[in-house]
């Protein structure tokens, strides 16, 4: 029975990290598309838009890093 719990833990970690990565990739893709739309409409605002783009991209990318940290904690500390 212990082996089944460890296997379920591995699956849970894989799903958690995988879904977080997919969500971040979709979010950054949408964000990049909107940045390009904004830059095409208002070329004068590109420096301001670029700064905001990188800040929000960092925040969107932080969620999968937290999920990876929690997944590694679950994988090595709990099992």
From Swiss-Prot:
Gene3D superfamilies from the UniProt entry: F1F0 ATP synthase subunit C
GO CC terms in record: plasma membrane; proton-transporting ATP synthase complex; proton-transporting two-sector ATPase complex, proton-transporting domain
GTP-binding keyword on record: no
PROSITE patterns: ATPASE_C
Record keywords, A-Z: ATP synthesis, Cell membrane, CF(0), Hydrogen ion transport, Ion transport, Lipid-binding, Membrane, Transmembrane, Transmembrane helix, Transport
Pfam families assigned: ATP-synt_C
Disulfide pairings: none
Record site feature (Reversibly protonated during proton transport), residues: 61
Subunit structure: F-type ATPases have 2 components, F(1) - the catalytic core - and F(0) - the membrane proton channel. F(1) has five subunits: alpha(3), beta(3), gamma(1), delta(1), epsilon(1). F(0) has three main subunits: a(1), b(2) and c(10-14). The alpha and beta chains form an alternating ring which encloses part of the gamma chain. F(1) is attached to F(0) by a central stalk formed by the gamma and epsilon chains, while a peripheral stalk is formed by the delta and b chains.
Similarity comment: Belongs to the ATPase C chain family.
Name this protein carries in UniProt: ATP synthase subunit c
Organism of origin: Buchnera aphidicola subsp. Acyrthosiphon pisum (strain APS) (Acyrthosiphon pisum symbiotic bacterium)
